[in-house]
From Swiss-Prot:
This is Chaperonin GroEL. Pfam families: Cpn60_TCP1. Forms a cylinder of 14 subunits composed of two heptameric rings stacked back-to-back. Interacts with the co-chaperonin GroES. SUPFAM superfamilies: GroEL equatorial domain-like. It is an enzyme of class 5 (isomerase). GO terms for molecular function: ATP binding; ATP-dependent protein folding chaperone; isomerase activity.
Length: 120
């Protein structure tokens, strides 16, 4: 039963991460798995589950605060290209994404579809 609960939790973490950020699902899954594993280990060793939950919540608040302080706005076409290139692992894809975003604007929608034609 615990394995199924853990699997559902990790699945939900990955889905939520993908919905909110669109990236980072592997990192979120690894972190969730570590939290579950260490949480169960600590509870088995006698830790108070509610105290453990409160500690995790405080840690999440602190990490979120630290990340928000170090976050930088991505505003220029070059910054968008660089960010997209890192995410895609390919500079040419980063440039294409930046060009598409430049054309549609911040509120625009970009649709990506599979094609059998090379280069399109």
């Amino acid at each position: 039963p615990y394995e199924k609960i853990g699997a559902e939790l990790v699945k939900e973490v990955a889905k939520k991460t993908d919905d909110v950020a669109g990236d980072g699902t592997t990192t979120a899954t690894v972190l969730a798995q570590a939290l579950v594993r260490e949480g169960l280990r600590n509870v088995a060793a006698g830790a108070n589950p509610l105290g453990l939950k409160r500690g995790i919540e405080k840690a999440v608040e602190k990490v979120t605060e630290t990340l928000l302080k170090s976050a930088k706005e991505v505003e220029t076409k070059d910054q968008i290209a660089a960010t997209a290139a890192i995410s895609a692992g390919d500079q040419s894809i980063g440039d294409l994404i930046a060009e598409a975003m430049d054309k549609v604007g911040n509120e625009g929608v970009i649709t990506v579809e599979e094609s059998n034609t090379f280069g399109l």
